[in-house]
């Protein structure tokens, strides 16, 4: 009888220990997930642009450039999900969109940062908008999946698994999308903002190239134009600046 009690006491002690360990593991996991969500939300909010339509009537002729001209790195294959684009020309109103805190990148020296965020925009041209149905189809074609924070993400695996390589948010604050079967046909936006964190999983240059290709493909499909973080036309010179930033950050992280 006493032996049976001892067994029950041992079982009880083991049960308590297991429950305590389970609680500690759950608490650690919850804190980790919460930290990741907060960090991602901070980055997203910092680099989502705010639309402020201007009365400025001056138009700028925008000439798109071939992919190979924008990003020269022939040893990296293009994403098979994306088709090649042809050169095209659009007219967009100048200064028709403004963004928060993004212009700081141009004037603040890098000073060996350990992390930066690269931003591209796809904006509708000539005072028009991007329409929900064509935008939705284009996002899926480029491998972007609707997910965390109610925005789109390009994962390592285009089916939606693996680490996030870059993300896409609505250009209108607060940045999320409200897509559903009822409103997708009527949904419109002046543009979308794409961003990626450097360092990133895998090859940062390749991941940036994927983001650039996705931006160009969305612009082609939806009738838009690819802009830099300051809402200026994306040029080969600006692409060189982006690539230099990537090299600088990767070098800074290697040196530590």
Swiss-Prot record:
List the protein's name.
Answer: Cell division protein ZipA
What is the taxonomic lineage of the source species?
A: Bacteria, Pseudomonadati, Pseudomonadota, Gammaproteobacteria, Candidatus Palibaumannia
Transmembrane ranges? 7-27
The main location class comes to membrane
Alphabetized UniProt keyword annotations: Cell cycle, Cell division, Cell inner membrane, Cell membrane, Membrane, Transmembrane, Transmembrane helix
- Record text on subunit structure and interactions: Interacts with FtsZ via their C-terminal domains.
What's an example GO BP annotation here? division septum assembly
Q: Which family does it belong to?
A: Belongs to the ZipA family.
Matches recorded under HAMAP family? ZipA
> Which ranges of this chain reside in the Periplasmic compartment per its record?
1-6
């Amino acid at each position: 009888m006493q032996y049976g009690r001892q067994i029950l006491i041992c079982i009880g002690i083991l049960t308590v220990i297991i429950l305590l360990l389970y609680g500690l593991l759950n608490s650690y996991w919850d804190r980790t997930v919460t930290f990741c969500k907060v960090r991602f939300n901070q980055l997203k909010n910092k680099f989502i642009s705010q639309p402020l339509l201007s009365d400025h009537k001056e138009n700028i002729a925008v000439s798109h450039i071939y992919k190979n001209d924008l990003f020269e790195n022939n040893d990296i294959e293009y994403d098979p999900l994306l088709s090649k684009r042809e050169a095209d020309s659009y007219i967009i109103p100048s200064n028709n969109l403004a963004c928060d805190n993004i212009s700081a990148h141009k004037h603040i020296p890098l000073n060996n940062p350990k992390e930066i965020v690269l931003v591209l925009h796809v904006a509708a041209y000539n005072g028009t908008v991007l329409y929900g149905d064509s935008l939705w189809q284009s996002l899926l074609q480029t491998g972007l999946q609707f997910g965390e924070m109610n925005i789109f993400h390009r994962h390592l695996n285009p089916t939606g698994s693996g680490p996030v390589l870059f993300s896409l948010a609505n250009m209108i604050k607060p940045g999320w999308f409200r897509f559903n079967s009822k409103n997708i046909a009527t949904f419109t936006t002046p543009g979308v903002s794409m961003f990626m964190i450097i360092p990133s999983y895998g090859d940062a240059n390749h991941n940036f190239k994927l983001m650039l290709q996705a931006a160009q493909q969305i612009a082609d499909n939806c009738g838009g134009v690819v802009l830099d973080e300051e809402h200026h036309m994306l040029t080969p010179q600006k692409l060189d600046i982006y690539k230099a930033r990537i090299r600088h950050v990767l070098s800074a992280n290697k040196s530590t």
